[in-house]
Amino acid sequence: VPTLRALQADGRVRYSGITHYRADAHAELERVLGAEKFDWVQVNYSLAEPEAAARLLPLCQDKGIAVMVNRPFADGALFARARGKPLPPWATEVGCASWGQFFLRWIASHPAVTCVIPATSKPQHMIDNAAAGRAPLPDAKQRERMRAYWESL
């Protein structure tokens, strides 16, 4: 951290942050964010891995720390569970035309989330992922409806 701070003071680094991809590291991320000032954190958060919403996302929101969400599809676990199952009949009301959009829009609509970074090597998936950002994001009531539907599958 001292080296990073020196690089920032020198103007060679503008923003600093920390990252992890597992829920069992959230407590350590919280500890570090409580002790050091960072501009952003990158963390896993999804319908399959919602643990960050309990403490880490509120902490970031309170401290003005930008949140980048990695692993939004939980390494494909969300798609595996949704395979063969229809989107809810009201999916278009929350701007979703695919399961990928459903998952991304649920994440992006959390008030602490700044951006979601899904990884893909398939152009069609990239197009679908980008479409998730076209409509207004779900509100708190819609997010809860999305979560409840997901839990019912």
Which residues fall in each region the model found?
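Beta/alpha (TIM)-barrel catalytic core signal, keyed to glycine-rich beta->alpha loops juxtaposed to Asp/Glu
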Residues: 1-153
